[in-house]
A protein has these predicted regions:
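Short helix-start
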Residues: 156
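Class I S-adenosyl-L-methionine
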Residues: 2-5, 12-149, 162-169
Length: 169
């Protein structure tokens, strides 16, 4: 399978996207995924680092280019749903990743449990006694530990994941 086009039930979108990322977006043969999702969800998927950034957007954008193609009004359906929808296209990124999916996903899960906290606070909470060593190494790698988690770019998260994989095993 190299293409997916679907209008999945809204309640399975998150698990579906994480499964697609884990199984297909890292494949050399997978080309394209087009989905109809809730408009708010589409906006989360496309969110740049900042206010709306989430575990979902950080993970999906790391493995795929996400593009909101079109907004579809609820009036176009019968019976009309309670929310507007959007058509989203995802194309796998063909870049070499520093870390495997599992390490990246574990790091994102830890970080985005507290998206409004600074990276420094998250590291201190999760890694307690080892946090001074980790924070020092992050600073050496030019990562601003005073930045809020939701403001981190995918490249910064990748650098953090690369460092944390030795502390998570």
């Amino acid at each position: 399978m190299n293409k997916i086009i679907s209008n999945p039930p809204f309640h399975i979108i998150s698990p579906l996207l994480f499964r697609l990322a884990r199984k297909y977006f890292i494949s050399d043969t997978f080309e394209l995924c087009v989905l109809i999702v809730q408009l708010d969800y589409a906006k989360k998927m496309c969110a740049p680092p900042g206010e709306k950034r989430s575990r979902l957007s950080a993970t999906i954008q790391y493995y795929a280019d996400v593009e909101l193609l079109s907004i579809v009004s609820r009036k176009n359906f019968f019976p009309p749903p309670e929310v507007d929808t959007a058509i989203v296209r995802l194309r796998p990124r063909r870049t070499k990743h520093m870390v495997d999916f599992s390490s990246y996903e574990r790091t994102v899960r830890i970080l985005f449990n507290m998206p409004n906290k600074t990276l420094r606070k998250v590291i201190k909470k999760y890694f307690k006694d080892r946090s001074p060593t980790i924070l020092e190494q992050l600073v050496q790698r030019k990562i601003n530990v005073r930045k809020h988690v939701r403001e981190l770019s995918n490249m910064e998260i990748e650098i953090i994941a690369d460092l944390l994989k030795e502390f998570l095993d």
